[in-house]
Every structure is written in structure tokens, then in C-alpha cells.
Amino acid sequence: MSKDNNQLVVETEFPVRYAETDAMGIVHHASYLVYFEVGRCQFMRDIGSDYAHIEADGCRLPVTELKVRLVGSLSFGERVKIRTWVEDNRSRQLTFAYEVIHPDTGAILVSGFTKHVWTDKHGNVIRAPKYWSSLLEKLPN
């Protein structure tokens, strides 16, 4: 991941919930995928869109690839801070990148990305909707 200092990075923060932890008392690795989705949804809202808007237009944005790199962990009751940005935007594909930050120390605990492809409601690959492209064009590069 190569975050550019001039691009929009959306930060989302919330507490770790008990159900997200495992028998060792730390956040289960699968929970980070949910955290990535929380960050992605907040990013969309912050730029003026969301999944409901995308789906109302007859489009879908399924995940086609993902990566999660864990170098630290969080426990129940600690706060999660997620940084989300668009890593790559192509006519038919979109990549979001993420960092899960320890809110007290600033340490990057988890990093990763999700790649998505634009489809119609039948699963056929399509170009990104024009409104989406125009929203991203307004963002800092």
C-alpha cells in the first residue's frame, strides 16, 4: 500500500466488541474484514455515496480479492481506529486500502486492501457509474 499524503484518508473509530474477540481475548482475524467494511462504508458516506445509492442504481461492488496483514492485536474494550483510502480506481475495478491503528500509540496493527469490481445486478462486469467517477475526481490525488 502506498498512501499518498495528498489523498483523502477517512478515519473511523469505535470500541472492540466482545463478540469480535477469540478464546485468546484478542480480536479474531476475521473481524478485521468487518472493520475494513466499516471503514469502506464510512469513506463512501464521507464522499457523498453509499452502498444503498450504488445498489439503487442497479450496480454492485463485490469484493474480488483481499489481503490482511496482522502485526499486532487489539482486545475487548480497546478502541479501533481504521484509516481508509482509495488505493486504485479504474474503469471497472476499485481498490480500497486500510490501516488499523492503535488509537493510543498510533502503531499500525493491521494493514490490507480489498479489490472490488463493478457489476450490474446480474453480476456482469460494467464500467463504474459516472457519478462515482465524478465523486472521486473531486478528491485530492
Regions found by a protein language model. Name each.
Residues 21, 35, 54, 73, ...:
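Short glycine- and Lys/Arg-enriched binding-loop motifs that mark or flank ligand-binding interfaces
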